[in-house]
Regions:
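Membrane-embedded, hydrophobic transmembrane alpha-helices
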Residues: 1-13
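Perimembrane helix-loop-helix junctions
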Residues: 6-8, 205-233
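Active-site lumenal/periplasmic loops and adjacent helix-entry segments of GT-C-fold
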Residues: 33-127, 145-147
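Membrane-lumen/periplasm interface segments of specific transmembrane helices
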Residues: 38-41, 82, 225-257
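Multi-pass, polyprenyl lipid-linked donor-dependent membrane glycosyltransferases
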Residues: 98-102, 119, 140-172
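Alpha-helical transmembrane segments of multi-pass membrane proteins
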Residues: 105, 132-136, 152-163, 185-188, ...
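Membrane-interface alpha helices of multi-pass inner-membrane proteins
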Residues: 142-143, 184-200, 204-211, 234, ...
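Short hydrophobic alpha-helices at membrane interfaces in multi-pass membrane enzymes
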Residues: 168-194
Length: 257
């Protein structure tokens, strides 16, 4: 009994040390990306229209016909509204474009968690390569994530979603169809809808939505299907409404709608 109690205490002590090391790693990443979000180089398009579009939203909200003043304002992005909301200009007298850095931090924590899981299981999976790819992308954009460019927002959201998606798939790929989870994939699909409102060119990734859709249809979860469709429309509606008000088109610069 004494030996078992001693072994239990040793296990608890080891777990606390590992847990403390993980939290220290995340704290270090937070400081690193806070530093990266405070200085660096601006994306060319930020000087051209990103920063101005965000400032327009800060000062006036949605301005009908704004794309007539500058055609680039028609490239509406959900990231601009998010950046305007968290710019906190009133606090220091100038905007703090730090949301891209926060998204980068989330992606970095996801990559770190993936690599720690690899170190623990000592077995290579597809998700491990995605974690390495995410780290390379973060290194590439580190000096420019101070810029509120929609390109960075979209890529960071996609990296996070795809890494999470593949990890889920790896965990249950041998499960029968009826036992596969639907909620995590459906919720990740809502993030993909948001990514499409950040950068319209990412809309092709919405094809992944077919996977949870098929699972839900096979399991005949009609109420959940209706709920997820409603949430997707709720996410997309503000973006579509701003498009119509700013440019007159539903999907600028495409003029067929």
């Amino acid at each position: 009994t004494e030996r078992s109690d001693e072994g239990l205490e040793n296990s608890k002590s080891l777990w606390r040390k590992k847990n403390k090391a993980v939290w220290l790693l995340y704290a270090g990443l937070t400081l690193l990306f806070a530093y990266g979000s405070s200085r660096g180089y601006m994306h060319y398009d930020t000087g051209l229209y990103h920063a101005q579009a965000i400032r327009w939203i800060e000062e006036y909200g949605v301005v009908p016909g704004l794309a007539n003043l500058h055609s680039r304002f028609g490239y509406n992005s959900a990231s601009f509204a998010l950046s305007a909301f968290f710019s906190e200009t009133w606090l220091i007298g100038r905007p703090m474009h730090c949301v891209a850095g926060f998204f980068a931090l989330l992606c970095a924590c996801k990559c770190a968690a993936g690599l720690m899981a690899f170190w623990k299981r000592k077995k290579v999976r597809i998700s491990d390569f995605l974690s390495i790819g995410g780290i390379f992308y973060l290194i590439a954009v580190f000096r420019e994530m101070v810029s509120p460019a929609s390109d960075y927002f979209a890529m960071l959201v996609l990296f996070w979603v795809i890494m999470t998606w593949v990890e889920l798939w790896e965990q249950e790929r041998d499960c029968p169809i009826g036992e596969k989870q639907t909620v995590p994939y459906a919720l990740l699909s809502l993030y993909l809808v948001y990514a499409a409102t950040v950068k319209l060119s990412t809309a092709v990734i919405l094809l992944l939505v077919l996977y949870p859709a098929v699972l839900l249809l096979r399991q005949k979860k009609w109420l959940q299907i209706a709920g997820y469709i409603a949430l997707g429309l709720l996410i997309a509606f503000p973006y579509l409404a701003r498009n119509v008000l700013i440019s007159g088109w539903l999907f600028y610069p495409f003029t067929f709608l």
